[in-house]
UniProtKB/Swiss-Prot annotation:
Keyword Transcription: no
Organism field: Schizosaccharomyces pombe (strain 972 / ATCC 24843)
Annotated catalysed reactions: Endonucleolytic cleavage of RNA, removing 5'-extranucleotides from tRNA precursor
Recorded GO MF terms: nucleic acid binding; ribonuclease P activity
UniProt keyword rRNA processing, yes or no: yes
Keywords: Hydrolase, Nucleus, rRNA processing, tRNA processing
Protein name as catalogued: Ribonucleases P/MRP protein subunit POP7
GO cellular component terms, semicolon-separated: nucleolar ribonuclease P complex; nucleolus; nucleus; ribonuclease MRP complex
Physiological role: Component of ribonuclease P, a protein complex that generates mature tRNA molecules by cleaving their 5'-ends. Also a component of RNase MRP, which cleaves pre-rRNA sequences.
Subcellular location field: Nucleus, Nucleolus
Subunit-structure text: Component of nuclear RNase P and RNase MRP complexes.
Amino acid sequence: MSVERIKRAPAFRKGIIIRRKTHLIAMIRRMRKKLDIDGSILYQATGMAIPHLVELSDKYKRQGYNISMDTATVEFMDEIVDEVSIQNKNRLGNVLLLRVSR
């Protein structure tokens, strides 16, 4: 019996994950209170959502926030582990990180 892979997700779980369908203006408004309390927010994006994260950084920069961008290499994990996913051990990918601070 073989099980199909449902979704490939990064094992890196720090910060807020930006997807291609994330509404950027709503995200900025929603995170404004957290940014005022904590002083900084960490966002992350992979693959097709990376241009979306760059656009988010431009919006924050225009509003006068300090931004820093970095990359990290992460391992992608399958939600359902089967024999095939055990054989494909090395599935590495890049994550773009955006830190916004006052």
